[in-house]
Amino acid sequence: MRKFTFRLWAVLMLMLVSLQTMATDTFTSNRTDFRDESIYFMMTTRFYDGDTGNNVLCWDNQSEQIKTKDPCWRGDFQGVIDKLDYIKALGFTAIWITPVVQNASGYDYHGYHAMDFQHVDCRYQSSDGSKDGDAMFQELIDKAHEKGIKIILDIVLNHTGNFGEQTLCKEFDRNTDLATQALINACMIPNEEKLGSDYLTSVPYEQYQRRLGLLKNVRGKNEDVHNYWHHFGDFNWDFPNRWWAQIAGDCVDLNTENDYVADYLVKCYGSFIKMGVDGFRIDTSGHISRLTFCKQFIPQFTALGKQYEDKRLNKAPFFMYGEVCARYSDVTYRGQDNLSCYYYTWQAPQELLDKWDGSQKYWDTQVLFDKANGGTGVDDHQMALCESDNAPTPTSDNTFMVNGKWHEPDYSQASGFHVIDFPLHYNFGNAAAAYGLAKSGDNRYNDATYNVVYVDSHDYGPQQTNDQFRFSGDDAQWAENLSLMFTFRGIPCLYYGSEVGFRRGAPIDRGPHGPLSETGRAYFGGYLTGDVEAKDFGDYTATGNVAATLNHDVAQHLIRLNKIRQAVPALRKGQWTDDGCTPADGGIAFKRAYKNDSYALVAINGGATFTDCPDGTYTDVVTGKTYTGSTITVDAPATQGQLRVLVKDWKGGQIGEDGPFIYNETPKS
């Protein structure tokens, strides 16, 4: 009898494992909706050094780089390739990498100071010279796809660096020999006809003024005769004139309202779509008007995505999301719709699009100077047209369940462009604040289930006491935020190292004023030495430091959350409501539904009571317990990050093992 009972138990366990394996296989092969993804965000040069021979010092702050043995250009594409299994072991299905195009500035390891949009930076080439940066990037895309991982490329449309741009205004020839890259005068050969024969002997300030003058008309004469750059001077971060202004010395504002400029950018970045990148994260989107996006970029990139869909993993639709920076605690940025994140998710009015005139013929009639040089920096038509795009947006129930059910969303007014959820990010000092903001503001987005959600990044942390620092919360606070991110609406995104609290509370960026090792952009490679092999998302074997990294409490929490999210379509793509949800102990509770196929009840930081639940059997994928009835009460310890996910008609049993934050009755480290 004992043998029979044991055999029956073994068969049942095998059936449960088989059902979960089938669900995983279905998820892996059917990821054609980007909401299926979870994103790991890295600064490529700071992640992992896979080719030590191509390390390069930035031009500025070289003494600190040498002293700390930490060249800014340290991580590389080979390093990402080598650690794809690490990212897969964590359960992440997509990688967002910082910009790859050729850069030029004193501190350009991050990639946001372009001098040539047509080529991958030469500092990404292999050290033996056999593969240039373009070839190495193609290899990364291909290797990632082989692992079932998508690549999101960070791109910049808003600006160049201040060393010109090789097509729009060529100021330098670039020597791409790797050995010359740490020496500015060895790798940057000035165009003396444009910059003067005494350029190299001039003081740095004079060199900068000469370079900038060719782009910005700041020397009292019209040097940018075709208006490839904007010429607006003083601006206010809180006014639409932020669309026309140079936001930093190394960020020279491109005239994206000029068709020639926009077409050139589309052509350059289109080559990466052709290579097979799966999506774009678009930098400084909030410094470009919505009208410009809807006219110049979104339709064009969407068409290119369709043209080259065979290059992408699973032929999924090309995905784009933008950084509409809104360092503000409310969903509407300082009372202004057209500067708010949600505004960009809606299509611009057709009557304004029809008035567009970005032709070179028009722009060649405009001679523009900023106020300091006797002008206004404002053209006769285009800028005013963009600023007239300021009508209040509609509201939408695309994010929400209606009458307790999923409903077909209405995308007839959608722009096709999605956003980083800056309001949630800014409120992620704790999960309750972020969730509360979503309750009041999700109707402003066309569909907030497409928002990319993170706690902190390479630019800002949440507004704790100062957003210039990486999130300073302890592991339990991380667990709480992550439990919400991976079960609530939106696409979860994690900044590299957060899985172990890396550089917790550190200043995010100090520029060339001190070593990178003391900032939130420190080198992470020491945590990744050793070997890791991922058989599937969240299923791995590892040795060395990388094994210890993966075994960190927060990393293990992430692995389980990724598994739960991947198993339940409602958590990835579902609409939500808190109707009929009463959390216990000050926690959070909501319902998620996707079509007629997936329905889940979620409780965070404790238990909850759910009413008006559809008939069926609900299985808590955290504990394996089952519930029935239209009113369901689930108990759970009232601890940070605690989670219950009751899935209707679920057949697979418990997902993952108890840990320090998610568990049945007793935490396990």
Kindly give the residue locations of the regions a language model identified.
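Boundary at the C-terminal end of the N-terminal hydrophobic targeting segment
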Residues: 21-23
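Structural recognition of the beta-strand scaffold that forms the well-ordered cores
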Residues: 38-43, 93-99, 113-119, 150-154, ...
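Active-site-proximal helices and loops of the catalytic beta/alpha 8
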Residues: 141, 159, 191, 267-274, ...
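Substrate-binding/active-site clefts of carbohydrate-active enzymes
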Residues: 31-37, 45-275, 297-307, 318-333, ...
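C-terminal beta-strand-rich structural cap/linker in extracellular carbohydrate-active enzymes
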Residues: 38, 629-668
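Bacterial N-terminal signal peptides that target proteins for export
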Residues: 1-9
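Active-site clefts of carbohydrate-active enzymes
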Residues: 250, 448-471
